[in-house]
Amino acid sequence: MRILWVKVGGLWPLDTGGRLRSFHTLAELTRRHRVTLVTTHGPRDEPAGLKARLAGCERIVSLPYAVPKQGTARFARALLRSWLSPLPVDLWKWRIPALREEVSRLMTAAQFDLCVADFLLATPSVPLNGPVPTVLFAHNVEHMIWKRLSHAEPRLWRRALLEVEWRKMRRYETEACTRARLTVAVSEADRALLAAHAPRARVCAIPTGVDTAYFTPNGSQETPGALVFTGSLDWFPNEDCIVHFGEVVFPRIREAVPDVSLTVVGRNPGPRVQRLAAIPGVRVTGTVQDVRPYVAAATLCVVPLRVGGGTRLKIFEALAMGKAVVSTTVGAEGLPLVPGRHFVQADEPAEFANAVVALLRDPARRKALGSAGRRLVEERYSWSQVVREFEARCEEVVAHAR
């Protein structure tokens, strides 16, 4: 197939779950298909590094674009304009005329069999019912993230704004799924949600993969009582959960296990996350080149998400390294894991703290959970297996379009 792949927000470095999922899918597809990638890069991204690591792409076009940041005049203008349009602000700020023009030009100039809109954020730049059949790669159910943010927001004025946003996002997401030839969700739970809201859409579920050769137990010594959290800290659900964990849950754990420590690993921590470093036993690393040493040194991994969508690659990566994981229901949502067999599930602060304390005191239980998790991802969720399924669904779309 000749594939046109469109993604906003950059792809390199691989410092978010979405980038990892997109990168590994593309890397596998380029082994067997002719792929043109059209993307954007911000001030901290590395387009040259991307081209070197996706050398199998027939062509890569990366346009400079800095997304408006909250609190800036550009963001205020985007917010105002989005209020006057059907687009929610999260999509309005990713409207990139130059990108849309480049996509239209390529669709006219080349004979593509398929276009992939990578994330809902790419759809303002892609004609979903245009001349090339389009697949929407939905890493999240976006409106559910905004809905959960609305319900978790304590300030009434902000909750009212978020209420408007999630309803606009639901309308747009429903329309986009309906217009695309196929929507690929990353879990059965997401597939069911999208299908319920867009009954005329064709939606399938393809699981998330993990690089089981890169994330592997390395036999290094664990630090006793060490907890680790990994994730992009400029994504609000990650910021929200780790601040809540550090301020509410971690002190409960420390009462029972005084020498417990918490390492927060991830890019772009804001002031709220940075302030956690003032709590005894907490370390905030900021951006790191490689998360594996931090995961390897940890006694267990915590995923205390309260809002979110899609699937959490951080859990698969921890399991691939043979680590025990304590996660909320939302944190493990969409992953094919059995609570009690592959991870420990806990939601309320006291319940989560008790689960962590129990595992810190039970090395045999930690080892059993980590071993079961490693077996699961190794046997069923390598990227080569997952992308073969993605590829087959794309080939069906192309066959039906002929």
Question: Where are the predicted features?
Answer:
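Conserved catalytic-core segment of nucleotide-activated headgroup transferases in glycan assembly
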Residues: 196, 204-297
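Acidic donor-binding loop of glycosyltransferase active sites
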Residues: 181, 281, 293-310, 321-324
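N-terminal subdomain of nucleotide-sugar transferases
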Residues: 1-63, 108
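Donor nucleotide-sugar binding/catalytic pocket of nucleotide-sugar-dependent glycosyltransferases
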Residues: 135, 143, 162-217
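Acceptor-binding helix/loop patch of EC 2.4 sugar-transfer enzymes
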Residues: 8, 69-93, 132-171, 232
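Short hydrophobic beta-strand element within catalytic cores of glycosyltransferases
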Residues: 314-317, 324-328
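Conserved acidic donor-binding segment of nucleotide-sugar-dependent glycosyltransferases
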Residues: 343-350, 358-363
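A short, well-ordered alpha-helix in the C-terminal region of glycosyltransferases
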Residues: 365-379, 386-392
